[in-house]
Every structure is written in structure tokens, then in C-alpha cells.
Amino acid sequence: MYEPTLTVESFDSELAGAIRDERRRQEHHVELIASENYVSPRVLELQGSVLTNKYAEGYPGRRYYGGCEFVDIAEQLAIDRAKELFGADYANVQPHSGSQANAEAYMALMNPGDTLLAMDLSHGGHLTHGSPVSFSGKFYKAVHYGLNAHGDIDYEQAAQLAQEHKPKVILAGFSAFSGIVDWQRFREIADSVNAYFMTDIAHVAGLVAAGVYPSPVQIADVTTTTTHKTLRGPRAGLILAKANPELEKRLNSAVFPGSQGGPLMHIIAAKAVAFKEAMQPEFKTYAQQILKNAKAMAEVMKERGYTIVSGGTQNHLFLVSLLDKNISGKEAEAALGRANITVNKNTVPGETRSPFVTSGLRIGTPAITTRGFKEKEASQLAHWVCDILDDIHNEKVIADVKQKADELCGKFPVYQELD
């Protein structure tokens, strides 16, 4: 029996201290990592709910354990809301992460050794899109397309590689591309070689749900996503598809029992409430502001002489290439971090440094938009980033920006209602 009155603070002060410090960091640091966001108190509450106690292998109405009548309600709500939100005919809400959702979709669509055509990691793809260090590059033969000289996806290269390699799956999706993907063009390329067309919208799912970024859900055979990032839900995954009963069976089997056991019911409940939040009119306003803030920041950095990959942004993120500066992405990330501005180093097209050093920065606006930043604050922030990058070893500049960033964060608290 455990002592129910002991708090984490009184029982485990070391862990409580780390959480307290992380809470403080989130309040006092400007978050510009494109894949991060701040969930609502409702999502936080459900992730700590009693649903974490329930084992529920299987699917609603078809469980291997008894006592699932109430978690069935939670999961069915999540399924129905996901389908409605994204205009999908099928949804599986059990994947534990976006990477796992991709692995499960691959399992349903390919056999080991089959060919996958996807975007190159250094041009904006993702580790799970066939990188040799990932399961996706170890279990499948990966071929990669990239960006053209204009910074757009090279569809002609993708079509040529499709004809040459006859992939089983053609994947469109990205982790660091600031443009709009022509989903229909990829559909046509896939059809030309009788391949499955799969999309990974992990980064833009919230924008797609809000209708401010084109949806691939009824164009692709299968769509995967995370449920955090722009969607602002718990850290987890989701698989969507248009109507195809045979494929739906294979997807369900790939998730359970193919690669997962018991689903995380507390996380699935948090997904359900996040999907409901994304259906509200204010979520579209939020998504529109994400785009405005990203464009404002990218424009300032261009004016200040920094190279924006693809020339600008049409979504929530943009890549800053530092190839023409005497700065590495690692140095830039560290200097900005000392000013309480959190970004991540990122590889860029034409990369000359290792993935642990890089020649670029990825900047995203979902989290600052959740705080309430608008174009004015986003533009100020971009100037501060440039001030540091212009004189990266000047600790006085860094200290001045840190003070201004802290003052700005104080005006836009993240979790004031939890204090």
C-alpha cells in the first residue's frame, strides 16, 4: 500500500525540483522549436487521470480484458473526433508516437526490403523517412528526393526516381520544409508506378485541421501525424486513411498486435479533448496567427541579411541557412539559449557539417502563438535573434536580449491559471 497523502514534493524532492525548474524554464524562455507547444490544462489533467491504470488491449468493443466499458467510450470519442476533424474515413488513435505511427503504416504497406521513396533528411525530411540510422532505413530500401534550386520540392526528381526504382510506397511529408506540398502531384507520381501514397503531416496537422494548409487525407492512401506540435495535444501519434476496408484491417493489425500491446488510455483521452479543442472556431484563429507570426519573423531575418531556405515560409516554420556566415547551427543554438531563446540547430541543403553541428537553424511559431504573441512580438523577437547572430560572441548583447526576452515572457504567461 502506498501513502496517499504524500505529494511528489515531499516524497521525491529531487524530481519535484527538476519539474519545478522546467516549469520555470517554460515560463521564462521563448520557445521557437517548431515541434514544441504548450498543451491546455485539460490535456494536462487527462494525462494524469485514472485512465492510466486501465489495460485495454484490442479496440473498442473487442478487448482482451474486462472492465473496458468506460475506456471504450474515451477511445471511441477520440476516433470519431479525429475522423471528423480531418475528414478521414478511418482513424487509429493508439500509436504512441509519430515515429511509431510511421513504423506501423510501413508495416501495413510494405514488406522488409521493399523500396520507400521519401524526402532527404538534409533537405527537410525526417529520420523515419528512410534515414540509414533509423529502422526505416534499415528494414526498407530508401531512395530520396530533395529540393530544387528554388527551394521547392523537386517533383521532377521524385517522378524520375519513382520510374527508376518502382517504390512500394511514396511518402510526402517533412520536418523542416517551409512551403506547401502539392499532394495531388505526388498522388499522380505514385499512381504512375502503382505505389501506395503515404503522407506524414506531423508538423502541419494543426494547420490542416484548421483549414489553413491543404489536406492530403482524402488524396493519400494513408496519413500519419503526431498529436502535439501545431495540433497542441499530448505527445503521441495518429493514423488516418480514406475508405479502404482491407487496408484498415492491415493498419489495425500493424498497430495491435503487430507493434504495440496495451494502449495508453490516459493519452488517448487527452487526444480526444485536444481534437475537440481543435474543432472550436478560436483554433482556426490560432492557426492563422501561427502563419502570420512565422511570415513576420522570416521577413525580418531576410531584411537583416539572413538566408531563408525556400525564400520564406507558408507554414509554421522556416529554416535559416548559416552557410554564408561564419557560424554553425550548434554555436547559434547555444548563444540564443543563453539569451533564453530556445531554437534547434538543423541541417540545410548543401550541408557541410555533421548533424551534431549543422549549418542552420529551424525556427517555428506554434508555442509563441499559444502564449499570445502576434506580429509585433514576433518581429521584435526576430530582430533579437539577428542581434545575437550578428555578434555571436558578444555576451553583453546576449545579456541585453535575455532581459528583454524575460520581460516579454512576463507579459504573456503560459500557465497563469495553474499558479
Curated annotation (Swiss-Prot):
EC code(s) of this entry: 2.1.2.1
One GO cellular component term noted in the UniProt record for this chain: cytosol
GO biological process: glycine biosynthetic process from serine; tetrahydrofolate interconversion
Substrates-to-products reaction catalysed: (6R)-5,10-methylene-5,6,7,8-tetrahydrofolate + glycine + H2O = (6S)-5,6,7,8-tetrahydrofolate + L-serine
Transmembrane segments: none
Gene Ontology molecular functions: glycine hydroxymethyltransferase activity; pyridoxal phosphate binding
Cofactor: pyridoxal 5'-phosphate
Residues with N6-(pyridoxal phosphate)lysine modification: 229
Keyword terms: Amino-acid biosynthesis, Cytoplasm, One-carbon metabolism, Pyridoxal phosphate, Transferase
Localization of this protein: Cytoplasm
Coiled coil: none
Residues binding (6S)-5,6,7,8-tetrahydrofolate: 121, 125-127, 354-356
Pfam families per UniProt: SHMT
Main localization category: cytoplasm
SUPFAM superfamilies on file: PLP-dependent transferases (SSF53383)
HAMAP family to which the protein is assigned, alphabetical: SHMT (MF_00051)
Complex formation: Homodimer.
Family designation: Belongs to the SHMT family.
Protein name (Swiss-Prot/TrEMBL): Serine hydroxymethyltransferase
Gene: glyA
